[in-house]
Amino acid sequence: MKDKFYELSIKTSNFYDEILELVFSFGVTCVEELDHEIIIREEYDLKDIAWGVEEYAKGLSSVRKISNDLKISLNLKENKDWLGEYKRAVKPILVDKIYIRPSWEESLSGVTNIIIDPALAFGSGHHESTNSCLQLLQKYAKSGDTALDVGCGSGILSIALAKLGCKVDACDTDEQATQSSLSNAQLNEVKFNKIWTGSIANLEQKYDIVVANIIADVIFMLSNDLKKSLKKGGYLVLSGILNKYEDRIKDTFKDLELVEIKQANDWVSFVYKEMDE
C-alpha cells in the first residue's frame, strides 16, 4: 500500500446521474455515493478524470441551458486507512432472497448469502441498477440455465446466477474486473464455466439468460451481439440505464418481446425475451 492516495470529490445536483454514469465508464475501483456527491479514491493521480468530469458538465450545461453547479476538488491525502473507513460505511443489503454482505459481517440464515468486499470493482448491490438486476435475475433465471454476464465488474451478478443454479459465463473488457470476479467467486465458493477479458463479438454460444448491467452507450454498441447471444425463448436483462434512454432502448430492441420494465429513481432496467418461432 502506498503512503498517499488521491481523493476526488464531485458535487452536483443538476448532473448527478449523468456524471455517475460517466464515472462508472472510467473503470475506477472505489466509488462512494453520497447525497449529491461522488467520491473517488485511488492510489494514482485522478486529474485526468477530474478534467473529463469538468468538461462533461460544461457540455451538459451548454446543451441543456441550465446552470453548471459542479463543484470538484482533488486532494492528495495520507493513506492512513481510507479503506478501513470505507468498510465501516458499507452495510449489508437484502435484495429479495439474496443477502449481500462484506466479509466482516455475519451471514444471514434462510437466504442466499453473497460476499462482496469494497474496492474490488463495481457492484455491491447498493446501486439501483445492480439492485434491480438482482431482483430480476431471481425472477427469470432457473436452475440449469446457461447464463452470460456481460460487463461482469465485481462478479456480483455472475455469482448470483451461479448460486441460483445457472451455468455461468462472464466477461469484461477490464482485466481488473475479471480478476475481481474470479476472486469474489472463490470467496463465495462458486465456479464460473468460463470467464474472459474482452467483448462478446463473434460469440458462437447462445444462452438462456443474458445480463448486461453497463452504461447505455455500450448497450447500444453491443445491441446486435446481445441479441445474437440469446437462445429462442431466452431472456435479456439490461440495466445501468438512465431513464432518458428508455425510448431509444425500446426502439433498439423492438425486435424482441418486452417482458418487464423496472424503475428505481432515475435508473431503469429492462427484461426482453427472444420470441419462440
From Swiss-Prot:
Cell compartment(s), UniProt: Cytoplasm
Q: Which domain of life is it from?
A: Bacteria
Per UniProt, the keywords (alphabetical) are: Cytoplasm, Methyltransferase, S-adenosyl-L-methionine, Transferase
Q: Which Pfam families match?
A: PrmA
Q: What class of enzyme is it?
A: transferase
- What's a Gene Ontology MF term here? protein-lysine N-methyltransferase activity
Question: One GO term of the cellular component aspect?
Answer: cytoplasm
Recorded hits in Gene3D superfamilies, A to Z, give: Vaccinia Virus protein VP39 (3.40.50.150)
Query: Its function?
Result: Methylates ribosomal protein L11.
Describe the family membership recorded for this protein in Swiss-Prot or TrEMBL.
Belongs to the methyltransferase superfamily. PrmA family.
Q: What is this protein called?
A: Ribosomal protein L11 methyltransferase
Q: Which gene encodes it?
A: prmA
